[in-house]
Amino acid sequence: MSVIETATVPLAQQQADALLNVKDLRVTFSTPDGDVTAVNDLNFSLRAGETLGIVGESGSGKSQTAFALMGLLAANGRIGGSATFNGREILNLPEHELNKLRAEQISMIFQDPMTSLNPYMRVGEQLMEVLMLHKNMSKAEAFEESVRMLDAVKMPEARKRMKMYPHEFSGGMRQRVMIAMALLCRPKLLIADEPTTALDVTVQAQIMTLLNELKREFNTAIIMITHDLVVVAGICDKVLVMYAGRTMEYGNARDVFYQPVHPYSIGLLNAVPRLDAEGETMLTIPGNPPNLLRLPKGCPFQPRCPHAMEICSSAPPLEEFTPGRLRACFKPVEELL
């Protein structure tokens, strides 16, 4: 197979008209055993209406990237680099400005909706509170708008559900409530941190379809954090593959999914269970993700990589090898396709 020939927008042009521009993002935590770098010089951009999938194993830095953008890092965390949203720097904003930004411009959906909803308040009260606080709506206006948003996320009998408590909903319905709450203020950016992890496969598909529909309806940019590459194929426009806090590969979702050019991306895809592989042994990536306190020299994936070479003891640069596509690997692209 030849080197990929895809009409992809060069990175410089993507950054020029981006809603969100992240440059050299670095997240470090102070621990008794030393500093841990959870995110290491991350770069990406996102335009209005686009979906970026951030993919990787546990501990790769996916969630910490989101928490850094939202200003939700733990007390021992430090941020470096730059993140501009609508041309405005958002890292290290004062708390009152962050609260306004999080309420009106950027929203986040967390993994477990049950722990995100107040079990002592009716769902309707929690939705209405957002609108009354941030949109200065009256109680009656907030009620009707909340019902409309529950309808938008395909909640059956939305008006009736407003009077129910979180424990009366199924997992999928609770996640629909969280999506509705996140979209009430019509944010320009929605960050979804593993939003389907606790759901069964059928409900996962429904939530992914719903997010796709809402993205088109509201022209919302989405950052989808996941370890599931099937999710990436179904909803994302671009993909960032992370390992040990670093970018391994970045590009158009279709290209990364069908023609990955980094051994780690290839390993993740090979590990996805297939319905047509009956009787075959499931492939895995050997070894374990590295200890971030004691990273291997050079490429962090080197100890687990089937293509490791002597040169991999040096850190490979992240290079744009074709317009809009990045990778950090010394192995020639042609030998991986």
Curated annotation (Swiss-Prot):
SUPFAM superfamilies: P-loop containing nucleoside triphosphate hydrolases (SSF52540)
Class of the enzyme per the UniProt entry, highest EC level: translocase
Principal place of residence: membrane
Topology with respect to the bilayer: Peripheral membrane protein
PROSITE patterns: ABC_TRANSPORTER_1, ABC_TRANSPORTER_2
GO process terms (BP): oligopeptide import across plasma membrane; peptidoglycan-associated peptide transport; protein transport; tripeptide import across plasma membrane
Subcellular locations according to the entry: Cell inner membrane
ABC transporter domain segment(s): 20-269
Keyword Protein transport assigned: yes
Keyword Cytoplasm appears in the UniProt entry: no
E.C. numbers: 7.4.2.6
Pfam families in UniProt: ABC_tran, oligo_HPY
Paired cysteines (S-S): none
The protein's assembly and partners: The complex is composed of two ATP-binding proteins (OppD and OppF), two transmembrane proteins (OppB and OppC) and a solute-binding protein (OppA or MppA).
PANTHER family given in the database record: D,D-DIPEPTIDE TRANSPORT ATP-BINDING PROTEIN DDPD-RELATED (PTHR43297:SF7), OLIGOPEPTIDE TRANSPORT ATP-BINDING PROTEIN APPD (PTHR43297)
Family in the record: Belongs to the ABC transporter superfamily.
Protein's name in the database: Oligopeptide transport ATP-binding protein OppD
Native source organism of the sequence: Escherichia coli (strain K12)
